[in-house]
Amino acid sequence: MQRSPLEKASVVSKLFFSWTRPILKKGYRQRLELSDIYQIPSADSADNLSEKLEREWDRELASKKNPKLINALRRCFFWRFMFYGIFLYLGEVTKAVQPLLLGRIIASYDPDNKEERSIAIYLGIGLCLLFIVRTLLLHPAIFGLHHIGMQMRIAMFSLIYKKTLKLSSRVLDKISIGQLVSLLSNNLNKFDEGLALAHFVWIAPLQVALLMGLIWELLQASAFCGLGFLIVLALFQAGLGRMMMKYRDQRAGKINERLVITSEMIENIQSVKAYCWEEAMEKMIENLRQTELKLTRKAAYVRYFNSSAFFFSGFFVVFLSVLPYALIKGIVLRKIFTTISFCIVLRMAVTRQFPWAVQTWYDSLGAINKIQDFLQKQEYKTLEYNLTTTEVVMENVTAFWEEGFGELFEKAKQNNNNRETSNGDDSLFFSNFSLLGTPVLKDINFKIERGQLLAVAGSTGAGKTSLLMMIMGELEPSEGKIKHSGRISFCSQFSWIMPGTIKENIIFGVSYDEYRYRSVIKACQLEEDISKFAEKDNIVLGEGGITLSGGQRARISLARAVYKDADLYLLDSPFGYLDVLTEKEIFESCVCKLMANKTRILVTSKMEHLKKADKILILHEGSSYFYGTFSELQNLRPDFSSKLMGCDSFDQFSAERRNSILTETLRRFSLEGDAPVSWTETKKQPFKQTGEFGEKRKNSILNPINSIRKFSIVQKTPLQMNGIEEDSDEPFERRVSLVPDSEQGEAILPRISVISTGPMLQARRRQSVLNLMTQSVNQGQNIHRKTTASTRKVSLAPQANLTELDIYSRRLSQETGLEISEEINEEDLKECFFDDMESIPAVTTWNTYLRYITVHKSLIFVLIWCLVIFLAEVAASLVVLWLLGNTPLQDKGNSTHSRNNSYAVIITSTSSYYVFYIYVGVADTLLAMGFFRGLPLVHTLITVSKILHNKMLHSVLQAPMSTLNTLKAGGILNRFSKDIAILDDLLPLTIFDFIQLLLIVIGAIAVVAVLQPYIFVATVPVIVAFIMLRAYFLQTSQQLKQLESEGRSPIFTHLVTSLKGLWTLRAFGRQPYFETLFHKALNLHTANWFLYLSTLRWFQMRIEMIFVIFFIAVTFISILTTGEGEGRVGIILTLAMNIMSTLQWAVNSSIDVDSLMRSVSRVFKFIDMPTEGKPTKSTKPYKNGQLSKLMIIENSHVKKDDIWPSGGQMTVKDLTAKYTEGGNAILENISFSISPGQRVGLLGRTGSGKSTLLSAFLRLLNTEGEIQIDGVSWDSITLQQWRKAFGVIPQKVFIFSGTFRKNLDPYEQWSDQEIWKVADEVGLRSVIEQFPGKLDFVLVDGGCVLSHGHKQLMCLARSVLSKAKILLLDEPSAHLDPVTYQIIRRTLKQAFADCTVILCEHRIEAMLECQQFLVIEENKVRQYDSIQKLLNERSLFQQAISPSDRVKLFPHRNSSKCKSKPQIAALKEETEEEVQDTRL
């Protein structure tokens, strides 16, 4: 960034904003880059502002019991705020004084007042000087107030972020990510531009008092008729506003429903295509859109009448003010024109400025109170540590996640002790206490010495992660003691990657040690992966590490934990995404050797890990089931395997027992409560703890079903922040509505507006921040994975010796603290955060306007209708002026002289009542035409919006994955949220306002041209100057606005990234580092926003200066050319003032239209996306001689012998796959064939391309080569027909918001009996029956009430219903509880017994049921053989399989002389050694 010219600018340059000229010139000539933007003044830096406000807030907290944030803000900003307010008031006063001088100028032309004629020229000079003074006062004042508003926003942004990093996990569990984003976006945006309006709460009443005094002097009591009308009008507008709010609140729920479904569709677009659900999703979203648009139209009509009322009120205010006076004393032209000028100012003060100011104060105080409540929430308490401690001790520790349960626990325990029970057994106490709430950890004891490895095991929900959280201080123990040194390193269960390079992710702000870094890289098996990237470890990873495989992310997270020098290393299931060989190598080299002298706590379920551990702790339902060594475990707890894995062999249970297990599993994985809430219920969640969900928590204590909920790290659908134009797995907008929260939707929507957290099962059932932190980012990454993704190759060579690691291990054990580095590479920050600028022009092209107008045929006729009405209005205005100009002057006392062909100054009441009749008739006509001329326009523009939305939706659903892979999910969602909201709400009325203002200006110019041709000559160059200035400014302003919009993304991205990794941040003590990063992101945004505000003020000031020059010319031309006794000067000066103020408004409105039309350009860009390919080859003869097109009919999911596919035979020839056109090949020359009904397992290391191959089968990638199913080539049929041949269980489970029935059968092809039959078959019946409404129960939020296992069963049921002959399974057992895993295995054997199954899996047990194995290595097929051959050869499979698995496969190999074919059967009862959760 460049140094700002503002620093060296002179006072004059600052006053006229001339220092912005270089950036305006550059923006006009070329495209602006981030490097062209000026640095912010030091006074605006986030560091300075946040420190200033934080100091005052701390002072407020320390000095008062009831601290007020507004007091802290007042001490920081009040005096500057009032200073600019006084300037603003003085500028407004000049508006009130101008009509006085105008009246004196008109009066000087009264034939009876000749002595004033000589001072007319001086009055003209005075009038012009007032305009100059107003310009010099108003613009610096408005800019100064905007500047203060910006500083307040920055300071509060920073304060909220710092507080977020300090919040306790219990508080985070109650706050949704939507609420946090809402706090930052909706509430704080009110300060940016609203602060300039705040002063009108006192300026407007003073202005009205001054104006009424001046009008009283002119018209006496009749002045109050006009004021009365304005007050009635303001009340009418307030009523319309309330009505509009009612419609908008109703519509918010509908918009939310549509956006929830749309975001689910976008993030799961690969699954939608795989299931062939494009038409179903399109129809579903269009139906929701239809109901939404009905309310949109109602709200638009109300807003239209509100806007029209303002435009046409001016006519009647003047009429009602002058009428009573004129009837009594006659018409005085001087007074009419002066009154018109006064009423223009009065109308603005009463109907616009004051109501807006009141609304601004109401919104701002509400926002400040919300932030104040947030800033007083409970903070995370760091435990008291003793740095000299070498051991880790936990004594009698009990803990609850639910806030308040700890206090209840203490009271209950105290009561229990008071009873003095004779047996002294605590079991009675705990069983009674379960009614209040089950502790997540109960009476835990262990002690480990320095350098020991403690393995923690247990089934899902046993409390393993909670134990680590308690050691880190995230979970506060209700009783008991924890003792350790406090120097902790942590590796999360779900890998967390921050935006930045691989190196920055591993070093994580700690000072760099080359030897240490290289040793860690080697131990974590990252050397080979890093070598694949051109930039090596300096490659920039996007948010969530989207370009990496799950295994690569897991190893980077582990490397980060190991790189930090700590006394205690907490490793929470770090090997979940690794193949068995990599896991084994890392466990040996890293955990056992590299960290040999460090204390380690490893959460695991692997038998080999337990054997190597010094101590083992097995948790069961929060209690310590066993603590000791492995040999003690085998002797004392022979049943430990079932506790370790969660259940016994599922197949051995009766149907009733299975159902009870499923029911219990459902309860454990659900969140509390069972009362359904209507789909449209969308309530704003308050931040106060006494809110709705707070009450439900209190009630839940008495509900035994709710109280058994434990804190369990359950894999739910991943969540992320995408409306922020950043990509990851899942945009957070699914939980968050993007409905505008105020009329200024254009300002709010780009900042990710939030109105509610979406429809939910219950208030508690939403995605809290805590859920966000405990969710995996690893699911379904193949849809996004770029060609740069590393592909690890399977190395069969022995590993190098680890002597270097031995050396480093000793270095790591030394008590040397490393320095913390806070340096941040700003270039990397920009690269991480800023997208490439959109490929649409800086200024909207004429082609876009033309295309927009022609979307709907009737729009052209509506525009012609508006023009006809306008011509009628101009004609009516000329009639009124003709009446005023040609009514003869009659004096009551003397009628001997009259002046023909002249403009009379006085008209008596007795002779000219007919003037008023005509005037009233014309006024009524204007009102009727004015009110209703815009309605057809608004109606038609909303219809255009509907058409564009439907076209865009169709284009996205039909676009190829190669195109969608290049787009970010947040970017797509923004088109459907922000841009469609602009097309619905802002664009129709902005276009109406612009057309209205333009026609008013043209009409006024036409009237002036008739009266005074000289003025018309002066008007032409002014209009040309306006157009040229607009074109010059627009080029730069639109680019700056775009840069500012893009600069907003990193702020919210960084917030969500920080929340996802909050436990890691705290464990590493990196809060200051991330605060610095956040301030950098804020400063980047501030630089763009400040420059935009400055250039906007430059433009507004130049427009004002042109107007002043024009008015000076008009004033002197009028004064010097008007003859004696003529009142024409009044009409000319009044119209000139009206022309220029309206023209300024029109120019600004045209800029708004151009800015909003960029949304239309973006929508058109999406509409023009390519569609998925159609068949390219002609139909080929089938094997039996018939034409393939006769065999290939639309698969109606009915099994008949003559319908393709019948057998499921599959032949693959020379298959090559790429993610994007022209990209690197992910798979090359893959060839193999599968017999009907055969089961094939895909083998390969993490990132080798197994999931990619499954995507290629479905034609979701750019592919070359050929695949045939039962002899039919994929080139000879449609994509829909081809994909319907497959049943799919994807890695990323897709549950959209809708009923169970809709989720299983979106096309509504099957009866309830058939759906229930399939549900029973896959074990879903008992799950569905638990919910009210059963099949009609509405699932929301990605099916958050279901466990990951139940979601997998839903996918399985879909595949059974599809009756497909080929089944593709992509790691179906990932994150499954053992119960669901057993169900899936059983269903595959029963329901798909005669189907071809292609399985990509990490569990060996599942792979053993495959007859053939396809080994993928270095993008190619390395082996394709049966189990027997792979076991005999040196292969990946041979290395992964254990001796016990071989015995299971070939039980008779040693006893039988004759080798028979192996029988693939279900696993029998598992022994202790076989229960391991081994992964390939």
Curated annotation (Swiss-Prot):
Chain segments carrying region Disordered R region? 654-831
According to UniProt, the reaction catalysed is: ATP + H2O + closed Cl(-) channel = ADP + phosphate + open Cl(-) channel; chloride(in) = chloride(out); hydrogencarbonate(in) = hydrogencarbonate(out); ATP + H2O = ADP + phosphate + H(+)
One GO biological-process annotation of the entry reads: membrane hyperpolarization
Q: Which CDD domains match?
A: ABC_6TM_CFTR_D1, ABC_6TM_CFTR_D2, ABCC_CFTR1, ABCC_CFTR2
- Outline which residue ranges sit on the Extracellular face: 99-122, 217-222, 320-339, 880-918, 1012-1013, 1117-1130
Identify its membrane topology class. Answer: Multi-pass membrane protein
The segment annotated Interaction with GORASP2 runs over 1386-1480
Q: Which UniProt keywords apply?
A: ATP-binding, Cell membrane, Chloride, Chloride channel, Endoplasmic reticulum, Endosome, Glycoprotein, Ion channel, Ion transport, Isomerase, Isopeptide bond, Lipoprotein, Membrane, Nucleotide-binding, Nucleus, Palmitate, Phosphoprotein, Repeat, Transmembrane, Transmembrane helix, Transport, Ubl conjugation
Chain's role: Epithelial ion channel that plays an important role in the regulation of epithelial ion and water transport and fluid homeostasis. Mediates the transport of chloride ions across the cell membrane. Possesses an intrinsic ATPase activity and utilizes ATP to gate its channel; the passive flow of anions through the channel is gated by cycles of ATP binding and hydrolysis by the ATP-binding domains. The ion channel is also permeable to HCO(3)(-); selectivity depends on the extracellular chloride concentration.
Tell me its family. Answer: Belongs to the ABC transporter superfamily. ABCC family. CFTR transporter (TC 3.A.1.202) subfamily.
Q: What is this protein called?
A: Cystic fibrosis transmembrane conductance regulator
Q: Which lineage do the record's taxonomy fields give for this organism?
A: Eukaryota, Metazoa, Chordata, Craniata, Vertebrata
